């Protein structure tokens, strides 16, 4: 039985609505991510969606395909550094390109640049393909692309490769104190 595609809804009351009992026993040994624990602590409803990890393609576009969601609804989290705000996180649609000038402006800075991939784990505690705006090692400013408002729900990484959290954009904003701005070209 392929357990990867079973839909799991986790509510703040910690009740699991799961399709079958076999999935319950498989999930008991798996620890929740920091992202999920933060949402639980804030009583924010979300859906945890899992899919098989392809180490050759860790993109948000691939995640969207695996989740059968529009790529514009699956947001990737990018880590950048600005001259005034320091390290920041930008959540943008999976196939979009980050506009660094727009990010700098949103962060009240003059300049922004992407951090090197080798720095991401040390800065956030997350691996490439599993970087979440929730639960990083430090609390960095989070900027959410304005296109998120077009959706009732968006998906962001749960903090582990192959896991996405689906939640309302307003709930993500509240959880990470995000600033919404036009961040893409």
Language-model segments: which ranges?
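Extended, low-hydrophobicity, polar/charged segments
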Residues: 3-185
């Amino acid at each position: 039985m392929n357990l990867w595609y079973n839909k799991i809804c986790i509510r703040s009351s910690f009740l699991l609505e799961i399709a079958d009992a076999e999935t319950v026993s498989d999930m008991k040994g798996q620890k929740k991510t920091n992202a999920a624990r933060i949402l639980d602590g804030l009583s924010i409803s979300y859906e945890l969606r899992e899919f098989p990890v392809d180490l050759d393609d860790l993109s948000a576009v691939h995640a969207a395909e695996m989740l059968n969601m529009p790529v514009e609804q699956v947001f990737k989290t990018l880590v950048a550094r600005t001259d005034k705000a320091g390290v920041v996180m930008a959540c943008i649609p999976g196939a979009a390109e980050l506009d660094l000038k727009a990010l700098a402006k949103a962060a009240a800075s003059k300049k922004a640049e992407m951090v090197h991939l080798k720095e991401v784990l040390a800065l956030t505690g997350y691996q490439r393909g599993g970087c979440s705006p929730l639960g990083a090692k430090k609390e960095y400013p989070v900027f959410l692309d304005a296109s998120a408002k077009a959706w009732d729900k968006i998906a962001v990484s749960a903090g582990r490769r192959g896991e996405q959290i689906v939640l309302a954009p307003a709930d993500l904003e509240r959880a990470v104190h995000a600033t919404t701005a036009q961040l893409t070209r």
